[in-house]
Every structure is written in structure tokens, then in C-alpha cells.
A protein has these predicted regions:
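Active-site environment of divalent metal-dependent phosphoester hydrolases
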Residues: 33-36, 67-73, 159-161, 193-199, ...
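N-terminal, active-site-proximal structural segment of metallo-dependent hydrolase catalytic domains
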Residues: 2, 6, 19-78, 89-96, ...
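Active-site-proximal beta-strand elements of phosphoester/diester hydrolases
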Residues: 23-35, 111-115, 148-157, 270
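Bacterial N-terminal signal peptides
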Residues: 6-16
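Acidic/histidine-rich helix-loop elements
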Residues: 28-48, 117-131, 158, 233
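Metal-dependent phosphoester-hydrolase catalytic domains
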Residues: 163, 167, 177-186, 194-280
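Active-site neighborhood of phospho(di)ester-bond hydrolases with catalytic His/Asp-centered motifs
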Residues: 63-65, 86-87, 187-191, 210-213
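Structured beta-strand-rich core segments of catalytic domains in phosphoester-bond hydrolases
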Residues: 61-151, 254-257
Length: 280
């Protein structure tokens, strides 16, 4: 009887480990740049809660937007289990960046780069009618738990230029098509500064799956992601997304917008999106 109990326990543990290996937790997070004019919402007052939030949810990979060099350093120092990829929009170590942080024990990086959303994507540049330089950072990861390979693209589209937003998405999709000759699964995430009913998002949904729309479980949390640091108001403006390539080996099990706060203060003016994916 004891032997049977031992075997059953071992099977249960191994099954749990297998299920965990098949799961992939992804997060996108506009962390709000470090700017003194934010007053009580300055990064120095937010960074500890931000880091503790990441520690609690334990994403395997998370993409950030608006990260200034000092913020990237703070995150890397506080969350030493992650390595990060990506450079600033004004050049290496300059300006805001859209970094990809990944669990360094679970993943190896096969390929990575940062390009600019412009007519000259290989050099720091501002595209079309954009107000600022904008970038996309991407990486090809190998999951050391499963030996699966997949791409991650992380971006922050312009907040002003309508043409820049549309052509920025088109440029990224073109880059995905060029790079992904082996048809690996693709995760495309970030702050798109575009709401769900805008044509560019509708068109993107025709070629990739919006994780919110295809989640097996009912989406959790507020309907929007941009909170503007206003904890006393509903969050209804949705401008952040995680898209998954259609007909890929990844399925969306759970989707959530996380509205955690401490003392009625958010860790950013955006709420993060957290999804749990699973391999088919």
C-alpha cells in the first residue's frame, strides 16, 4: 500500500512539473518613464512596488515600454533572475526603450535586435508623422524546458502620429514575415496607443490573434489599461495588447489586466497585461 501511495505521489508531482513546463507566462507593461514632474508618482516612489509585483506574478518573459536607462538598471538589479534585451530609442543607453526581460534559467536567446519604426529602421530615426523616435525589440527564444522555439516582439507606437502608428505595425509585421521563415509561434506585444475599434487594430486582428479575444478563460480585470494614475476612476481605455500568431503551437489559457495598487497608488499610469499561454 505504501509503495502504491509513493508511486501515485510521484506521478502527481511529475505531472505537475510537466504542466508547468507547458505553461508560458507573458506580460506587457508600460512602466511610465522616470520624470520629476510626476511628483508623488515619480519612479522613485513606484519602483519597489513594481518590482514586487513582478516577483509575485513571476512572468517568464515581460516586455516594458518607456523605460529610461536608470529604470532598466533598477529593474535588472531588483530582478536578478532576468536578463534583458533592447536598446534606447535614441541609441544604445539613450532615451526610452522597449526591453524584453526573460528568465535566464529557462530561455536561451538565438537571435535579437532593435529596429526603428521609420523609413530607415537600422538607425536611430523618427518615422512618418511621429512625435518621437520609436523602436521595436525582438528576440528568438528557445525554451530550455520544452525545447520549443518562438519569437517575441515588443514595441511602443507613437502617441500622436496616426500614420506612424499604422505604418509602424505594418513594418513590424513585415519584419516578422522576413525573419520567421521557419514559421515559429510569434508573440507581438506592447503599448499600441490605439483602441480596439481603430482600423489598425482591426487589421492586425485579421492576421494575429488578440489574446483577450481568444483566451480560454474569461478575461479578468478592468476593460482598459491606461489609468493615468487616477485610482478613483474606472480604467476603460484599452491601448496595450498581446497578440499571438494564428494557428501556432501556442494557445491562450488566461488573460488578465492587473489593477494592483498600494495605498491607492498604481505602480504605473498603465496597467500590465498578463497572459498564460500553453503549448498545444
Amino acid at each position: 500500500m505504501l509503495k502504491l501511495t509513493y508511486i501515485l505521489c510521484l506521478v502527481y508531482i511529475l505531472n505537475g512539473l510537466s504542466m508547468d513546463a507547458q505553461s508560458l507566462k507573458i506580460m506587457t507593461y508600460n512602466i511610465r518613464l522616470d520624470v520629476p514632474s510626476d511628483g508623488e508618482n515619480n519612479w522613485s516612489n513606484r519602483k519597489d512596488f513594481f518590482s514586487s509585483q513582478i516577483q509575485f506574478y513571476e512572468p517568464d518573459i515581460f516586455g516594458v515600454q518607456e523605460a529610461k536607462p536608470n529604470q532598466v538598471t533598477d529593474i535588472a538589479t531588483a530582478l536578478s533572475q532576468y536578463n534583458y534585451l533592447g536598446i534606447g530609442r535614441d541609441g544604445d543607453g539613450k532615451g526610452e526603450s522597449s526591453n524584453i526581460f526573460y528568465n535566464k534559467e529557462r530561455f536561451s536567446v538565438k537571435e535579437t535586435n532593435t529596429f526603428w519604426l521609420s523609413e530607415t529602421p537600422d538607425i536611430p530615426s523618427k518615422g512618418w508623422d511621429a512625435a518621437f523616435n520609436r523602436v521595436c525589440t525582438y528576440a528568438l527564444f528557445k525554451d530550455l524546458k520544452t525545447n520549443k522555439t518562438f519569437w517575441v516582439f515588443n514595441t511602443h507606437l507613437d502617441h500622436m502620429g496616426e500614420e506612424a502608428k499604422t505604418k509602424g505595425i505594418q513594418l513590424i509585421l513585415s519584419k516578422i514575415k522576413t525573419l520567421n521563415s521557419k514559421n515559429y509561434p510569434v508573440i507581438f506585444m506592447g503599448d499600441f496607443n490605439s483602441e480596439p475599434n481603430e482600423n489598425r487594430i482591426l487589421e492586425l486582428r485579421s492576421v494575429m490573434d488578440d489574446s483577450k479575444e481568444v483566451s480560454e478563460q474569461k478575461p479578468y480585470g478592468p476593460s482598459g489599461t491606461f489609468n493615468n494614475f487616477k485610482h478613483d476612476q474606472p480604467v476603460t481605455k484599452l491601448i496595450d495588447y498581446i497578440f499571438i500568431s494564428k494557428n501556432s503551437d501556442l494557445k491562450v489559457k488566461k488573460y488578465a489586466v492587473l489593477s494592483d495598487a498600494v495605498d491607492l497608488k498604481y505602480p504605473s499610469d498603465h496597467l500590465p497585461i498578463f497572459v498564460e499561454l500553453k503549448y498545444k
